[in-house]
């Protein structure tokens, strides 16, 4: 009896042991648990601490509650915030106030930020939560000069305790950035990027010490709720769900750190139509908070959001205006014998065109004034299209951030109000052409008979290269035949060539029909729209020390 009991007991124990060994795998197959991101990487948010200490502490605790283990601060935290981060076990990455700086200005910018660095190091001696210092955000890290500066300041940070690690935040692609080995870690600014994780993996193939410094997309305040509405709060949440979930690909290692941009909307963003916060400026949470909490804590990976109503079809006003101008141009050509004859003379027999202009008979001022209106309208409509396309491109914000505040405010206001851009561009074109025409007519009258009707023909007809810009602008868009980047290239290159052509053709025709000295004609070229516009750009770049090369690299090497 005892032997039988012992055999049964031993058999039962063996079966229980086998069950215990295989139970975890069996239970995982039935109800798989979600991996916690804190096991493999530090996840956090970008944060600007409020000036109120109580508000700052409250927000920091809420970040810890949603599963954040790191915080990237855009300014120096107060002692109370650092102390609370110590107790919460958070890692603090603190940016120095060095933002969108070209290579020649980086050393001076870091020297000005040196007092902030010293205060940060003093704070870090008392608070182990402060582990990293950001030397620069969106500096021109595509040139070796920047790398040398960052390397010297990294050595300076390492030279004295505490042992802070350095990083910089960059929007540039891995193929363009050259300074990864100048700091301890590189953080990528991939806000608005269509494939942020792919951008990080491209970087990861070049260097191991690279994380995500700013992930997210913007919410447009005027957007209707629902996934069908572009840049709605729900679309922001879906973007973060897809981006953060891809970090848990079991076949690849995740980044060492990733920050969602940002905890709360900025008070004064570069573009007021772009709000990146998980909360609005008043502290009200958006649906993206639920996504971040679920993924950061490892409790949820799939989320449902309302689709909302289908967005209303955009206004056709600009399209009707654009093609209306094209139709009006065709109507003028079909109904006006003067226009048809002048077209033939202008393009096939320029000598006869100049003879007719010199004689000044039957110039039809009304038809030429209408042509001037079409040119001005085409420029205005093209400006509206360009502003609307710029408002939808992530790169626009980076370029604007690198401009001096007065210029930034003007351009940002124009991008946010495209109709105003069209009116201003059209008005400027009309005013500048009118000013130039008036000067040409008045000077010509000193030596010969020259009417304003002749001046109108002289200035308007060489402006024909402006007209193709309108259909090109109407055909440009993210899913249109002409991509936004190609349109920008055509607008910039074609616009410069058109300005040179108009200036040269007007001055040559003017010299041929007035017999004025060449020096006088060249002096009158100073009042051309090309010369005045170039002078304005040169003045602004010199006065504000703007690096055109840096702006170009931000526009072309960050997408």
Locate predicted features.
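Active-site clefts of carbohydrate-active enzymes
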Residues: 206-240, 260-275
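Aromatic-lined substrate-binding rim segments of carbohydrate-active enzymes
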Residues: 59-63, 68-102, 149-164
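Hydrophobic alpha-helical transmembrane segments and adjacent short intramembrane/lumenal linkers
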Residues: 414-427, 435-543
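Aromatic-rich peripheral "rim/lid" segments of glycoside hydrolase catalytic domains that contact
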Residues: 261-311, 316-320
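Glycoside hydrolase catalytic-domain groove-lining segments
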Residues: 175-226
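Active-site groove signature of glycoside hydrolases
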Residues: 117-144
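Boundary/entry segment of secreted carbohydrate-active catalytic domains
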Residues: 32-56
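Aromatic-lined carbohydrate-recognition surfaces of secreted/lumenal glycan-active proteins
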Residues: 154-175, 211-215, 259-262
């Amino acid at each position: 009896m005892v032997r039988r009991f012992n055999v049964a007991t031993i058999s039962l124990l063996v079966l229980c042991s086998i069950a215990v060994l295989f139970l975890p795998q069996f239970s995982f197959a039935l109800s798989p648990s979600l991996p916690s991101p804190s096991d493999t990487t530090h996840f956090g948010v970008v944060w600007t601490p409020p000036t109120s200490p109580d508000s700052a502490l409250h927000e920091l605790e809420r970040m810890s509650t949603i599963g954040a283990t790191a915080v990237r601060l855009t300014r120096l935290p107060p002692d109370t915030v650092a102390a609370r981060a110590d107790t919460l076990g958070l890692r603090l990455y603190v940016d120095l106030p060095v933002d969108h700086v070209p290579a020649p200005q980086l050393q001076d910018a870091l020297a000005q930020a040196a007092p902030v660095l010293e205060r940060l190091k003093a704070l870090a001696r008392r608070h182990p939560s402060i582990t990293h210092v950001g030397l620069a955000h969106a500096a021109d890290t595509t040139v070796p000069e920047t790398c040398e500066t960052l390397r010297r300041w990294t050595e300076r940070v390492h030279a004295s305790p505490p042992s802070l690690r350095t990083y910089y935040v960059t929007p540039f692609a891995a193929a363009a950035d050259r300074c990864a080995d100048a700091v301890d870690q590189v953080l990528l600014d991939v806000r608005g990027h269509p494939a942020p994780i792919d951008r990080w993996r491209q970087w990861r193939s070049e260097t191991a010490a690279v994380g995500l410094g700013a992930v997210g997309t913007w919410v447009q305040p005027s957007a209707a709720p629902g996934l069908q509405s572009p840049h709605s709060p729900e679309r922001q949440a879906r973007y973060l769900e897809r981006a953060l979930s891809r970090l848990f690909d079991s076949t690849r290692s995740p980044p060492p750190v990733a920050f969602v941009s940002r905890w709360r909307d900025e008070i004064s963003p570069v573009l007021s139509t772009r709000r990146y916060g998980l909360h609005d400026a008043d502290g009200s949470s958006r649906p993206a908070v639920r996504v971040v909490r679920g993924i950061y804590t490892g409790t949820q990976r799939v989320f449902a959001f309302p689709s909302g109503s289908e967005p209303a079809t955009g206004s056709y006003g600009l399209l009707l205006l654009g093609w209306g101008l094209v139709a009006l141009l065709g109507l003028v050509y079909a109904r006006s014998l003067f226009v048809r004859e002048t077209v033939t003379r202008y393009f096939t027999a320029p000598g006869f065109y100049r003879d007719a202009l010199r004689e000044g008979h039957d110039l039809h001022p009304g038809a030429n004034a209408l042509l001037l209106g079409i040119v001005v309208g085409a420029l205005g409509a093209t400006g509206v299209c360009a502003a609307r396309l710029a408002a939808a491109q992530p790169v626009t914000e980076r370029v604007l951030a690198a401009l001096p505040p007065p210029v930034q405010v003007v351009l940002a206001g124009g991008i946010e109000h495209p109709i105003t851009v069209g009116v201003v561009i059209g008005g400027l074109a009309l005013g500048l052409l009118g000013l130039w025409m008036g000067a040409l007519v008045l000077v010509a009258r000193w030596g010969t008979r020259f009417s304003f009707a002749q001046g109108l023909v002289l200035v308007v007809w060489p402006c024909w290269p402006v007209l193709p810009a309108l259909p090109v602008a109407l055909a440009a868009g993210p899913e249109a035949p002409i991509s936004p980047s190609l349109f920008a290239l055509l607008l910039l290159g074609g616009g410069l060539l058109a300005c040179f052509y108009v200036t040269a053709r007007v001055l040559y025709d003017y010299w041929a029909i007035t017999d004025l000295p060449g020096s006088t004609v060249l002096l009158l070229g100073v009042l051309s729209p090309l010369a005045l516009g170039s002078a304005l750009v040169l003045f602004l770049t010199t006065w504000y020390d703007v690096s055109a090369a840096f702006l170009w690299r931000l526009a072309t090497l960050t997408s």
